């Protein structure tokens, strides 16, 4: 199945049902009191994570999703039925972004998690709600409010522990083939990797981690050059980044400048991503004598002012890869897991007294004009007579 990690859809929550003006009808009772029921709330729109999905391709073909409208109220104080919600099933790791504000509306990082992306409209009030001692035959009602409409961009972010960075042909895919069972395409031309791929590395039965390989970056990627920085989002949840550097590029470019290019593009994309733990991995050390390779690596380290972790490997020969994997496993075992930023959910009060109190006093009240059959007069109430049997 084609890998699709981004799709734009329009979602519309259901409108709230309107209240109704109605009066009690019964044999021998010509004109009864008000019995107009409230409308039903509109249905909401949710996204829900499903571990059985791994692509957003379905949302490329259907772009509009609408929840059900709430039913209008009815006589006999019958409340309208609530509109049915609609749930969009997405792969684990998907987030929804409002395309107009770039606000992250929802994010589902674990199976079964369900988050609302569009709120249904409030129900309207029937005329029973307006009954009072001075208004015994109310003809007022309120209409249901409109449901929320949003255009959202669904973005699938791969869930991996280790993310790989580097220019095209640096050896990222070769490394994943060497340390895992994944078999991404490998060739001697740029941009062999066109979509992200994942590999599971099992150091020992009790220790394993997931590595993500993304298409190579080039200078100007932040401005859209090459494949752009579209795939960098897949590294946002990684706990450590491996910056792969080819010490003997096939195009004879400067490894120092190549490394600076990646660092610059990373910083332009996201300060948060640039601040993640990052290790340098010098690849293809088998292409030159050991002493010469060590001198070249030290030269690069000095030019970058690098004082953190670095490793020397030959991915194609699997030289140094085992040691690197053990180091990664130990590092992540001791690294405190990041706490997810969970936005505090809006507290929605479904009691009508708060929201509808304002609506009843405002301009949204609709008055039905029909005075012909009203047997209630507007004179001052003389009180009620209570009969008591001795």
From Swiss-Prot:
CDD domains: Obg. Signal peptide: none annotated. This is GTPase Obg. The keyword Nucleotide-binding applies. It comes from Vibrio parahaemolyticus serotype O3:K6 (strain RIMD 2210633). Keywords: Cytoplasm, GTP-binding, Hydrolase, Magnesium, Metal-binding, Nucleotide-binding. Monomer. The keyword Hydrolase applies. The gene is obg. Residues 1-159 form the Obg domain. GTP binds at residues 166-173, 191-195, 213-216, 283-286, 314-316. Its cofactor is Mg(2+). It is found in: Cytoplasm.
């Amino acid at each position: 199945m084609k890998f699709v990690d981004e799709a734009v859809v329009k979602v519309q929550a259901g409108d709230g049902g309107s209240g109704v003006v109605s009066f009690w009808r019964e044999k021998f009772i010509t004109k009864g009191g008000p019995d107009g029921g409230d409308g039903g709330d509109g249905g909401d729109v949710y996204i829900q994570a499903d571990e059985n999905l791994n692509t957003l391709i379905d949302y490329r073909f259907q772009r509009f999703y609408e929840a059900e409208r709430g039913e209008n109220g009815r006589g006999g104080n019958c409340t309208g039925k609530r509109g049915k919600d609609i749930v969009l099933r997405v792969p684990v790791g998907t987030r929804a972004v409002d395309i107009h504000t770039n606000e992250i509306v929802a994010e589902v990082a674990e199976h079964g998690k369900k988050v609302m992306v569009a709120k249904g409209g409030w129900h309207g009030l029937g005329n029973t709600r307006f009954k009072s001692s001075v208004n015994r035959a109310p003809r007022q009602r309120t209409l249901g409010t409109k449901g929320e409409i949003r255009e959202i961009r669904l973005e699938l972010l791969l869930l991996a522990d280790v993310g790989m960075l580097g220019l095209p042909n640096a050896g990222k895919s070769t490394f994943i083939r060497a340390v895992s069972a994944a078999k991404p395409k490998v060739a001697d031309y740029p941009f062999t990797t066109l979509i992200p791929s994942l590999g599971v590395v099992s150091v020992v039965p009790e220790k394993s981690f997931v590595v993500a390989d993304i298409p190579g970056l080039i200078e100007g990627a932040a401005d859209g050059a090459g494949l752009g920085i579209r795939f960098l989002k897949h590294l946002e949840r990684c706990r450590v980044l491996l910056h792969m550097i080819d010490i003997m590029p096939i195009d004879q470019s400067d490894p120092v400048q190549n490394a600076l290019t990646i660092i610059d593009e990373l910083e332009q994309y996201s300060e948060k991503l640039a601040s993640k733990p990052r290790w340098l991995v010098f690849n293809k050390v088998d292409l030159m004598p050991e002493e010469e390779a060590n001198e070249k690596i030290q030269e690069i380290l000095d030019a970058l002012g690098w004082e953190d972790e670095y490793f020397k490997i030959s991915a194609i020969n699997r030289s140094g890869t085992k040691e690197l994997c053990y180091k990664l496993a130990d590092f992540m075992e001791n690294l405190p897991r990041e706490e997810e930023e969970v936005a505090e959910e809006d507290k929605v009060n479904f009691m009508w007294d708060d929201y509808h109190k304002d609506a009843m006093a405002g301009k949204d009240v609709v008055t039905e004009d029909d005075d012909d059959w009203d047997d209630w007069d507007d004179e001052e109430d003389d009180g009620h007579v209570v009969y008591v049997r001795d």
